[in-house]
Amino acid sequence: MNPSLNAFRPGRLLVAASLTASLLSLSVQAATLTRDNGAPVGDNQNSQTAGPNGSVLLQDVQLLQKLQRFDRERIPERVVHARGTGAHGEFVASADISDLSMAKVFRKGEKTPVFVRFSAVVHGNHSPETLRDPRGFATKFYTADGNWDLVGNNFPTFFIRDAIKFPDMVHAFKPDPRSNLDDDSRRFDFFSHVPEATRTLTLLYSNEGTPASYREMDGNSVHAYKLVNARGEVHYVKFHWKSLQGQKNLDPKQVAEVQGRDYSHMTNDLVSAIRKGDFPKWDLYIQVLKPEDLAKFDFDPLDATKIWPGIPERKIGQMVLNRNVDNFFQETEQVAMAPSNLVPGIEPSEDRLLQGRLFAYADTQMYRVGANGLGLPVNRPRSEVNTVNQDGALNAGHSTSGVNYQPSRLDPREEQASARYVRTPLSGTTQQAKIQREQNFKQTGELFRSYGKKDQADLIASLGGALAITDDESKYIMLSYFYKADSDYGTGLAKVAGADLQRVRQLAAKLQD
């Protein structure tokens, strides 16, 4: 017999198998597999059948439960911000702004756990992260006062200023409902009626619309919020995250190269960096206006399509992301961010888009994760929750009180007077009308001129190419908007789009700014 075959003798095989099993049992202690009711599973490899050739039995509860749970693994996809990734971290307040806000999260030296969810806005779950899209930058602060959600984007402005246009805007951005294909002409048909979108469209079709990574991306509140101090004094603020990794974007050539290698490049970059201990950081800045300053601008400062040029920024803290999620679905997918999650000292402004988001985001999260979704671990506040809201599907609480109402002497729950909303003076009548100070084009021109020559050329090529396949009337209206913002910008776009420049000039001359 060949000596080399000795290792395959049956006796030696049994010894080897026994030794392997012993080594495994020493290194990994196996847990008992159970069903959802906690009962142990006897066989998870074979269905129970009526004999060797008979049908599968209905009494095989392990098989039935596995299939039932598999059929129900997914929750509704977010209608926007579906494709995302998340991480845990900490925010440390570095400045005393008690003159502006009584929120404990801003007390100098205060350390607050955070969860951040980065996302693409328009495109669906599992879409390539190289696609041109604004990026969500949403932060949940688990503060001593309750949870505060700062739900923003990488762009400092938005496409619209009134929430009543939000469903239409999203529909225009989404694929054609007939073919499920993306179609720029649908978007420009809509935006030809929305001149206030020109600045954010410029951002979208610039290289800022294709960031290289989430780590190398800034974030913005987009909206103004009110900060309220202990004396009830109000200041309007905008929040800005500044990446300490710098900013890096992809040009059109790089987009094609990256997408060919990795359609999850932004998620991979963030997860890999944190796994290696290269923790990304952002400084948080605020811009501040007094209420009386709002009337001093030639545009409406509470218009979400505008930035606040010339208003100094003040650093108030730093955030570090230092832990990846343990389970993507339970944390990143089930996290429920909403601008309505505010704490005393932070209130919404009168921004018309923000006012709609206060309802829409909380409502869509209730639709996605249920009425008790804020009780999920990733959404649960660190502070005590003491509410009379009750029942509903998947209520995992344990209430022992017989008093499910307020006020009550039997089981009193006191209100906190300092948490009342600040009083806001009002005048005028109810109305449905545009804001008075629109100024739709000036900031677009300033943005275009702030870009270097290469970035301008990339922008003109990307946006001009999209306009070239748009219907004629929408194309000329859009070109007139960009020409009104900056003549060089409009001229370059008209050339790429194959348009008559004289006609563009004539339309632009009729526009007011």
From Swiss-Prot:
The active site is at 81, 153. It comes from the Bacteria. Keywords: Heme, Hydrogen peroxide, Iron, Metal-binding, Oxidoreductase, Periplasm, Peroxidase, Signal. One of its GO terms (biological process) is response to hydrogen peroxide. Its cofactor is heme. Residues 1-30 form the signal peptide. Its EC number is 1.11.1.6. Its main location: periplasm. Heme binds at residue 361. Residues 391-407 have a biased composition (Polar residues). Coiled coil: none annotated. It catalyses: 2 H2O2 = O2 + 2 H2O. GO terms for cellular component: cytoplasm; periplasmic space. Residues 391-413 are annotated as: Disordered. Decomposes hydrogen peroxide into water and oxygen; serves to protect cells from the toxic effects of hydrogen peroxide. PANTHER family: CATALASE, CATALASE-2. Belongs to the catalase family. This is Catalase.
